[in-house]
Amino acid sequence: MIRLENLSKSYSGKPVLQELSLELAEGARLVVLGPSGCGKTTLLRLVAGLELPDAGRVSLDGRLASQPGWGLPPYARSIGFAFQSPTLWPHLSVVRNLTFGMNGASKSHVKETVEELANAFDLTGLLGRYPGQLSGGEARRVGLARALAMRPRRLLLDEPLTNLDGELKERIFKETLAFIEGFHPAVIFVTHDPGEAAALVENGASLLRLENIGRAA
């Protein structure tokens, strides 16, 4: 479960999020729709523990995760996240990026996961490459697959389908929804595309609209 209580965040004195509260149960999906600069990415970074709030609290599974001046580190939150600009490990191959953090899993599970994601996201021919050898769209698909690989309890997706071609975008969208059906994480999916948001709502997601001042519309 993800719970936000009166969450606020400013940059250089400019409010980005103001007193935002929401609760997302395990297995629930929330699509956050709004224009650039309304706080969508900031919301994800606060949930992930990459930033701390100026006011309010973030709780995960009933446990305090963030408040002003203190927060659990990202690795302690069971969160997978994929941002618009994928942060892949440049010195690791694609397959090593996918399996990073799966040290406790059996070899058979790791192999099965890599094969499943490679087939779903059209990565089979890229597994031996390094991030510097990937196009922007390829890197984005690897970043999305890596977010899913650990089957985290919470999944944060920041416009992961941006700049993908129409047919590939539709297939990756469907494959992502199919994959998460297998482990039912709480999902926050950020987009500025009303069509993308509508498709997610049709697949059972709730909708949160953010205005430019970071309040729920």
Set out the residue ranges of the language-model regions:
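Conserved ABC ATPase "signature" region
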Residues: 63-67, 109-126, 177-181
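Helix-to-loop junction immediately C-terminal to a conserved catalytic motif
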Residues: 48
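ABC ATPase NBD coupling module
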Residues: 64-80, 104
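A short, proline-enriched helix->beta-strand linker immediately N-terminal to the Walker B motif
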Residues: 149-153
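Hydrophobic anchor residue at the start of the ABC signature
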Residues: 144
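Conserved ABC ATPase signature
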Residues: 130-134, 138
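ABC-type ATPase nucleotide-binding domains, specifically the catalytic core motifs of the NBD
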Residues: 12, 92-112, 120, 210
